[in-house]
Amino acid sequence: MPELPEVEVTRRGLAPAIVGRCVSAVNVRTPKLREPLQDLAALLPGLTLEHLERRAKYLIWTFRSAAGEKRWLLTHMGMSGSWRIWPVPAPSAHKHDHADIVFGDVLVRYTDPRRFGSILFMTTDPRKSLPLTKLGCEPWDPTLTAERFYAELQKTHRSIKEVLLSGKIVVGCGNIYCSEALFAAGIRPTRPADAISKARAGSLLEALRKTLETAIAAGGSTLHDFHGVSGETGWFPLACAVYGREGKPCPICGRPIARIEQGGRSTFWCPHCQH
């Protein structure tokens, strides 16, 4: 599943090619992804893309009409989605290529084998409505201090891994990145959130930020379907200390990495180094 790093990699790849350009055509081949697709071929042409930003795992596309009216797309890549840039004329679409948005001589194509993604046209700012208003802080939000993070952790007895995955305090903590950040901070993934000291909470927040920054620089994680906008794979999994390394030696102590299940997801950790 594309997580925060993969969505940010996508945003950074798309923005220079299409921001400031006008939509000239749209081709939708699939009537329904996670939700039915609106008539984007009638709604988008003539609109100029002013801004492309990320909020958690969503992309917010802000458009302006010739009359100055703002319109938005709120997109989510679901379990297997990705956006790809092509010069016009683009290669013929394949089975899982569901939508093309054309900006003159540049085409962006949405591909999603499992069809759990979404493309929603909106006439109101999506940042002011659900689901975005229920999201936790961005990892680099300046208001998310170590003190605030610690205070939020004190409100729940759930395991720290489950709390991070929920996205209610801070967004972006996908399964791979949770395992890696918890290892970097030396915190056991099953430890209750309210049993983490203030100092260790600060270390965890720092580790999470560094893990996500490293993942973005690596182009994200390609485990199955994700590719960047030019078709490139993300190589972060090659640098993982614990994720996907069950039975292999811990890079710190040399003892075997363990795997457990939490909420139906695999967690990788070192029982010797994480407490």
Regions found by a protein language model. Name each.
Residues 1-4, 91, 139, 143, ...:
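Generic detection of long, well-ordered alpha-helical segments
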Residues 1-111, 115-118, 245, 249, ...:
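A cross-family signal for N-terminal binding/gating loops and helix N-caps
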Residues 22-39, 43, 53, 60, ...:
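Basic, nucleic-acid-binding surfaces and adjacent catalytic neighborhoods in DNA/RNA-processing proteins
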